[in-house]
Amino acid sequence: WKMAEALASGDFSRYTVDSYDWMYYQTYPFQGPTALFMELFIRLFGNGALRAWSLFGSLSAGACLAALCCIAKELGAKPRTQVLCAVLCLLFVPIPMYAPFVYGTLPAPAMVLWGGYGVLRFVKGSKPSWLVLPLVLFPMAAVVYQSSLIFVIGACIAVLFNGYKGGWRGMVRAVVAAVLLLAVPLGVRSGLQSWFFARVPIPYSTGTPSTAHILMGIHSGTYYGPGGFDGSNWDLFWDSNADTTAANAAAVKGIGEYWNTYLHNPKEIKFFLQK
């Protein structure tokens, strides 16, 4: 949010070389497009931007509920079951807290769910025009919250599997749709990330690799793990001299160490199962 404010005002005084804020975008450059999205709210609503963002999050919670009902309906559920399904899916969301959360925790799932509804209508044989919905919403979701790409990849896999039902024509149709559904969000994110770095006094960075996030996900959270790795992808990146390639090599090595530990030390299985 602070970066969004800086983008809107043009004041980047806090982003001096080697400051925490400067290092943050070197480590996590994928947050740049998110800041650009939030900048829209600051430019549109000024001092009321954070309230507008909270309202956007609250409305997104309702959009999630509506999308889940529509998806359940398409899967053949009766009206009462649709509502029950949607409510059960939302029980884990503490809406009052997440509505103002500045990582797009509610807007992103609303976008991917409605995009998923469009994908569902498409694979059920409806008009190809239903693809417009995910082709618009999936890129927006990927910009608001990068992890939305996990859902996009899942949607692409679903489209490909469904393509087998239609013979070679259906498969070609499915492959084209899947490529578009993945390529457009990735292209939009990449373009916005380049634009972001063109606007800020921070050198372009490819940041911490995905493998570092995987390693962070399987570590024990202490120095207990192989090699004494404490699980911080931030530290892994900067210990590798802010080099994405070197950080990736270190992360791959760490993942291998954990895997070998699990294979050769049965006591580690307990930790693995807990994870």
Please place each PLM-identified region on the residue numbering.
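Transmembrane-helix motifs of polytopic, lipid-linked glycan transferases
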Residues: 55-76, 114
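Membrane-interface alpha helices of multi-pass inner-membrane proteins
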Residues: 130-145, 177-185
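Membrane-interface transmembrane helices that cradle and orient dolichyl/undecaprenyl
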Residues: 75-76, 112-131, 160-165
